[in-house]
Amino acid sequence: MDGDFQSNYLAAEQAYGAGDFETAQSITVELLNQLEPLPEEGAERDAVLAWRAFVALLAGHIDLYGFQAPDQAESHYQLVLASHPQDTLRELAEQGLERIRSDRESVTRSTQATDPGE
């Protein structure tokens, strides 16, 4: 990946950190599009998979923590895992997925507790 790609990724991180989720999301969507199609093999494929894991993790965080959009976040976290990332990125994606599952279970329990029809 070239220097522009890395600069754009850093811009997305900075926008996310500043709470500008729309800009961060726009940049990450564009970056993920640039990573398609996935090369068939070799070092270039490994580099694309590594970047895809980083960008998808950031996109998942933007969706989950920025927009409270767990369904979109879940698909991005799954993309991280499908990229066979290093352990730290895998663990962060798994934490995001666990947070989504936990939040869904809390909503289900809350709904069942307040719905006497069940």
Q: Which residue ranges define each predicted feature?
A:
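Flexible helix-coil transition and linker loops at the boundaries of alpha-helical arrays
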Residues: Q34-L49, G66, S83-R90
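Structural signature of alpha-solenoid helical repeat junctions
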Residues: G3, E44-R52, A69-Q72, L89-L92, ...
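Residue-level signature for tetratricopeptide repeat
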Residues: L10, Q14, A18, I62-D63, ...
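Alpha-helical linker/edge segments of TPR/alpha-solenoid repeat scaffolds
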Residues: A50-Q68, L97-E118
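Short coil/turn linking the two alpha-helices of tandem helical-hairpin repeats
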Residues: E13, G17-D20, P39, L64-Q68, ...
